[in-house]
């Protein structure tokens, strides 16, 4: 459960969680934008490609957050195993799948209040507090966005544009910190 002071939740938790999700969405999109379309499906050995990871995130978010409070988060129409099959799709198809998941997530988050955090949802037949489901999804999503960034950076080689504080520039950043809050970070990524 999330921190409480008396009976009140500290701060507007749902807004903070939504801001963190927006930050990871922007981070993933900024990484994907640096990858040639042909390289989106590139794999090394048994690893997943960027395309597979993006497809999985889109499917996971859409399943979890469609009818979030009223239906099991593992929808009968979702085929999780299929999400991990190698695929060659256009950038537009890939981003459409990605966006469908994020739209479901942000739609669900927009309808929540902090009071809803104490409610339960069901995922794979098991009850889970809304707050726990949101934090679990945020951790899951950030894990996979990290994979996307790593693969994109690896594929870009010397042509990579840093999405955070560039190597060797921490002191300069600390003199004029930008992007410390999720909304600021999103705005900075969108300017690149």
What name fits each language-model region?
Residues 67, 72-108:
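Helix-adjacent hinge/juxtasegments
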Residues 4-5:
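Basic polycationic patches enriched in arginine
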Residues 110-113:
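A short N-terminal helical cap/helix-turn-helix that marks the beginning
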Residues 14-15:
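N-terminal leader segment of winged-helix/HTH proteins
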Residues 18-22, 26-32, 37-83, 123-192:
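Short, contiguous alpha-helical
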Residues 119:
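Active-site-proximal loop and beta-strand segments within enzyme catalytic domains
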């Amino acid at each position: 459960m999330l921190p409480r002071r008396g009976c009140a939740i500290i701060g507007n938790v749902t807004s903070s969680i939504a801001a963190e999700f927006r930050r990871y969405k922007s981070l993933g999109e900024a990484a994907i934008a640096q990858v040639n379309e042909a390289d989106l499906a590139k794999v090394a050995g048994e690893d997943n490609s960027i395309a597979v990871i993006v497809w999985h995130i889109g499917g996971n978010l859409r399943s979890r957050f469609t009818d979030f409070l009223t239906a099991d988060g593992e929808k009968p129409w979702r085929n999780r195993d299929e999400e991990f099959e190698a695929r060659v799709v256009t950038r537009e198809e890939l981003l459409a799948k990605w966006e469908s998941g994020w739209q479901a997530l942000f739609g669900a988050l927009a309808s929540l209040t902090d009071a809803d955090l104490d409610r339960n949802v069901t995922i794979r037949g098991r009850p889970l507090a809304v707050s726990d489901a949101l934090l679990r999804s945020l951790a899951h999503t950030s894990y996979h966005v990290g994979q996307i960034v790593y693969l994109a950076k690896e594929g870009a080689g010397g042509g990579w544009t840093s999405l955070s504080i560039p190597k060797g520039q921490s002191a300069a950043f600390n003199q004029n910190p930008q992007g410390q809050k999720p909304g600021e970070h999103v705005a900075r990524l969108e300017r690149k």
